[in-house]
């Protein structure tokens, strides 16, 4: 664990923030390159991703703060301390989708086509971001002396759920890229992403120790994952039956 990478004068470079920036840079570069291949202005893609990145972080933070409101009411200034971690993917997804629709509507572009273009690279960005979680020590797993690693901030040997999540997201990225290079209907890549992400998150949640049980032995994110799985499955079935 390395929550702090280094200090430059009075400024501290935090691993979590650094990984978020790296995730944005790498995903934007690769998405822009893919846009050129599809004869789409890469500047539009970069601007879209920047807008989605900012809105996604805000949405993810708001969702996380609401989920842990009692803790943040005790120390409100922690709400803006992103260097300590604390982003909820589901809030980021909701905000990111809304931001994408608004931006693409303004630009009068095909919404599903562009989302299909960028979504594999957002999965890659998530994979990189989870490395930041590992270095920061957030999103941690349950105690496991046999299969865990030592987290100094928790003074315990825990399951490295961040690492598992990062690797699974990398696999999702590879699958989506393979599908992207084959003929597909608009929206299909996006729904496949959700279909793959949902069981991934459900599994990881079963190993995590930082999210409370809310209903019948399941965490809130497991319940949301089940809902997203069936919504994405319905979306894929609809696209399969839809005439070109």
Residue ranges and their predicted role:
Residues 1-244:
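A feature for loop-to-transmembrane-helix boundaries and adjacent hydrophobic helices
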């Amino acid at each position: 664990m390395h929550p702090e990478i280094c200090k430059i004068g009075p400024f501290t470079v935090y691993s979590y923030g650094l990984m978020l920036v790296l995730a944005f840079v790498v995903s934007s570069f690769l998405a822009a390159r893919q846009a050129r291949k599809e004869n789409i202005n890469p500047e539009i893609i970069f601007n879209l991703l920047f807008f989605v990145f900012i809105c996604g972080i805000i949405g993810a933070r708001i969702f996380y703060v609401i989920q842990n409101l009692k803790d943040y009411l005790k120390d409100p200034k922690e709400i803006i301390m992103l260097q300590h971690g604390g982003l909820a993917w589901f809030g980021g997804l909701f905000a990111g989708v809304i931001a994408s629709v608004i931006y693409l509507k303004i630009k009068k572009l095909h919404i599903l086509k562009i989302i299909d273009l960028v979504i594999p690279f957002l999965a890659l960005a998530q994979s990189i971001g989870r490395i930041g979680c590992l270095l920061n020590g957030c999103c941690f797993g349950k105690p496991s002396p046999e299969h865990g690693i030592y987290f100094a901030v928790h003074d315990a040997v825990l399951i490295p759920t961040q690492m598992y999540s990062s690797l699974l997201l990398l696999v999702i990225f590879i699958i989506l890229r393979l599908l992207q290079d084959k003929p597909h209907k608009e929206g299909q890549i996006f729904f496949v992403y959700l279909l793959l992400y949902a069981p991934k998150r459900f599994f990881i949640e079963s190993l995590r120790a930082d999210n409370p049980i809310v209903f019948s032995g399941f965490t809130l994110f497991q319940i949301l994952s089940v809902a997203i799985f069936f919504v994405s499955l319905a979306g894929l079935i609809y696209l399969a039956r839809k005439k070109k």
